[in-house]
Amino acid sequence: MPGEITYGRKRPLPACPNPLFLKWLTEWRDSAAEKNLKTQFVYQKAISSLKKYPLPLNSGKEAKILQNFGDSICKMLDDRLEKHYAECGPNIPIHTVPSSSSTLRKAQRQPKAPSPLSIPHALEPPEQESQDLSPSKKKKTGGKKQREYVPQRRSGGYAVLLTLYRDTKSPSSRGYMTKAELQKEAQPLCDKSFTLTDPNSKYTAWTSVSTLIQKELVIKTHSPARYSLTEKGLELAQRLEEAEDQGRADGFPRQVQASSNEEEEQEEAESETNPYIHADPVQCPDQQLNLAYSHNAKNTSSDPPSVQYNHVPEFTLHPGDFNILLCVDFIETTGGAAHRKQELVTELRRNGVNFDVRKLHIGDFLWIAQEKVQPVPGQLRIPQARELVLDYVVERKRMDDLCGSIIDGRFREQKFRLKRCGLRRPIYLVEDHGSAQHLSIPETTLQQAIVNTQVVDGFFIKRTKDVRESAAYLTIMTRYLQGIYSRKSLLSCTKEEEWKCDRSLRPDASSCILVEFKDFNEGAMKNKAQTVKEVFARQLMQISGVSGEKAAAILEKYSTPASLMSAYESCSSAEEKEKLLSSVKCGKLQRNLGPVLSKTISQLYCTKEPLS
């Protein structure tokens, strides 16, 4: 007899350690919303960012390290905090909401009984909380009828349903499958790995199983877990199998009409597995999406790039024909105190690590697969070994260096360049160096910067206490990567091809695609020659309020300054010039650029006399 059915439950969100700042931001957002001002969205983004961070803030200035906190909001918080101290006294705690507000809030919430359908939220007005369902829930359930959930073809949910269905038809079926069995059998039916995460994401194809359980298509019983189909899941899986068989007969894959896709599975998986990421039921949920994870959602389609693009490698390194080599940036061995710089190299040699010191244009450490070459009779020089770069790059930061890089802006720029370099496993190696209490930035702010890098940017963070421990970590990583890649055939690709190829590393695959090291290192050069479009983008981003997304939206319409100037010249009046860019759609939510920024840009490019 199967045991009791257990369904996945959402983890409780941690309480915000800065409720006073959250309260003030919420008041400002609501006030802006009443006046129909667009600043409400700015406050909403700041609220979302603040709620994701587990550390307390002592001033608005400290909040500047958070995403979506600019000079204006930080100054407003400091001014409001000063007023709060003047009203309540200098010793009043700021990490709790004042009792008067608390009592009022409690009185307003008194009629509401706890219900599993409603989730308390700091941003929900009291009158909305007194209802059983939130407005967003009503919109979903009211009006048109919901369509049946059908997983996308070759997604994690699709593969799991088909695998369980085929198991039920097997004469040796036990009526259930374990997690390991299910992952192994379902992998050939899925384009994503069931065990390894996608680039810049924390989720695997296995996370879709929680969606299947919630939709009552799969049941999970016992411990260790056993998975089997429900009647509803059996019926859906049978239809998927029939569509698959029909597609094979027709010579092309056929897809059952689906009302859902992998984005829905990803959103539900995020809310279950990440306690810091959740959808806001009051304001637009899309604002809550983390930029670090948005790449996968944008590229979701029924077929992955690897199916559409037939990659032909320039060369292939077969198992036994290459060595895994750690590359160390020469900056890590020169400059500063000689004994300190050489200590890392000494420790690596002591640990028996095969490494090479060279100029790296990005990161401090990375790993390559270097071809084994033999001397050719009659030639004086050994042929040059071909090299492929692995998907791991390490940026090493001592606490004092982290402090300096935050102050001069290098920290944000380095993270931006690491995201764009093409290597999908960026690692920040944070090394303690004495006491952080005497640095020019508070220790709590440095800790927030580290959390920010992991939670918002999606980088892996490794903390070490000294150089010796850092060398030990690099040694372990080198051994680990040697074990992974040494048994695989490595196919080369160029920098231009890397986004077209399926470069995911699957444990059961016999080969993987890697970028040539020479192309990668040249492409990562900081001061390489730039195109007119790149310089134009940098120029636009110097204007206050123009973010990378907004600059990219302008470049889609006007790729060069000449094309923008030509558009301005075709305008019949100064007012038309000022409004030329106001309707340009920006970002994931496709909001207008707005008349204020449009006017500022037009003044910059259309004013002939000196700007003052």
From Swiss-Prot:
Keyword Transferase: no
Cofactor(s) of this protein: Mg(2+)
Domain ERCC4: 325-434
EC number: 3.1.22.-
UniProt key word Hydrolase: yes
GO molecular function: crossover junction DNA endonuclease activity; DNA binding; metal ion binding
Record-annotated membrane-spanning stretches: none
Name of the protein this chain belongs to: Structure-specific endonuclease subunit MUS81
